[in-house]
């Protein structure tokens, strides 16, 4: 059984009655959140979670080969009412689903960051990156502040990306099927609109 534990570590909390739970989660660089869970990211020297809220005892935390997933068990699926503080050493990819909310009060400063929001979820960050890749879909929303030299953004299916306060040198933006993208671009933008998508440019482009 030991070799299985190296591939996937699952922390099931449903057997505990306490509502305030803290645990180490091991090394990871990819994060996925489900079920309306609210997650605050905090840069740290350790990888750990602090879980509170009505459904904290029904939270499942799974780390498989550096991919960390946090969700509720089947009985409480989609219920939300769970707050997580995630202390992390490194993170390169953040994905949210099913009404989850992921945010950070601190600036995420690193070379590259990949953000994906799906199915009514929301993400909100201050960033300082060289490469920023952003995708929103199916009614989700992403709010971005700070700066990134290059920003590649795709929005679709009624989703929103609000990046008016994100300073860029170059941006590639695609909006389709009723999605809305709001951008501020310092130097250059390549914009593509399809099937009722909207891209609002809040500064002049320079060629």
Which positions does each model-derived feature cover?
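Intrinsically disordered, low-complexity terminal regions
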Residues: 1-207
């Amino acid at each position: 059984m030991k070799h299985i534990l190296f591939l996937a570590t699952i922390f099931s909390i449903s057997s505990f009655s306490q509502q305030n739970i803290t645990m180490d989660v091991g090394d990871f660089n990819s994060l996925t959140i489900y079920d309306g869970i609210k997650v605050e990211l905090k840069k740290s020297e350790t990888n750990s979670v602090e879980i509170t809220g009505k459904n904290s005892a029904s939270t499942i935390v799974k780390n498989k080969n550096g991919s960390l997933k946090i969700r509720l068990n089947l009985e409480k699926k989609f219920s939300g009412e769970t707050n997580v503080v995630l202390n992390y050493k490194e993170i390169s990819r953040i994905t949210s689903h099913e009404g989850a909310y992921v945010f950070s009060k601190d600036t995420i400063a690193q070379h590259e960051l990949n953000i994906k929001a799906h199915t009514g979820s929301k993400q909100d960050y201050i960033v300082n990156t060289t490469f920023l890749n952003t995708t929103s879909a199916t009614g989700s929303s992403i709010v971005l502040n700070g700066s990134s030299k290059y920003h590649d953004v795709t929005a679709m299916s009624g989703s929103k990306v609000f990046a008016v306060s994100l300073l860029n040198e170059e941006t590639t933006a695609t909006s389709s099927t009723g999605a809305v993208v709001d951008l501020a671009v310092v130097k250059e933008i390549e914009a593509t609109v399809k099937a009722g998508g909207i891209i609002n440019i809040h500064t002049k482009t320079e060629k």
